[in-house]
């Protein structure tokens, strides 16, 4: 399968080729429901994670969700949270029939691209010990040195880390104000507020 990563275009209803994986930022309630459905299948169904541990209060607290689709079907999801000097990779989830490389790799690549564009130089994750070698093979994500394994939700975890290189046009405090206002991941194209800037200021109450 070949991965098609698309953070700048909304999902198109036209069916994609079977082998294509398309990753987009979740922008609608329907997108988020798809991510929640996938996570429910994998974490609650397969790993028997309790509901209140899987849905931990962080899904609406400044998080960005990515959705992977093959054609019109959601097949994977991932959550990103943003801290002062690092991004946090969470809830990487792939449907059982789509595991094997292309879908998780597409989600990871999209997460790295998005975090780097936001100016982050490090992305950290909490990875189940059994999955750490797979993450290293797929995306060169390494285990943090000097950090002890830890346990939550019945699994043993390690901290993993990947260094990122922000692009020259990464978002900074000095970026154009209208660029900063654009939808997440769509900073290179005019948004609705760009269009509104063509109207003269009337300063209505």
Where are these regions (language model features)?
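Short amphipathic alpha-helix that is part of the acyltransferase structural core
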Residues: 2-54, 60, 67-70, 166, ...
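Conserved active-site tyrosine of GNAT-family acetyltransferases
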Residues: 39, 134-140
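A short beta-turn/loop motif at secondary-structure boundaries
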Residues: 55-61, 150-153
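Short beta-strand micro-motifs in enzyme catalytic cores
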Residues: 62-66, 87-90, 156-160
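Conserved beta-strand in the GNAT
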Residues: 67, 73-81, 86-93
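Conserved acetyl-CoA-binding loop-helix of GNAT-fold acetyltransferases
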Residues: 94, 100-113, 125
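Conserved GNAT acetyl-CoA-binding A-motif
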Residues: 115-128
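Conserved catalytic-core motifs of GNAT/GCN5-like acyltransferases
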Residues: 126, 141-163
